[in-house]
């Protein structure tokens, strides 16, 4: 289960506006919600096969985090020029990273081959 994040209510021009603090998620972004939702829907054979995703940032971290929590192997196809902080954060969750050159290679083809 994802950690709960606070809901802040602020009145703007007389209208209550709600703000969800997704920056307080474990990866610091809302992308973790979609990854968690999708991975929890996998059946056991799919979980055993593992997941492949492509991203250079928050989606990669979301998939990697959810996969680790659920015990699912994860491979992330990430451009070689992705920010080091994003690569390190993704690796820290236990995911494998497959690098590619975004100018000469297709992430979709690489991911399809790995799947």
PLM-predicted stretches and their roles:
Residues 1-115:
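PLP-dependent amino-acid enzyme catalytic core
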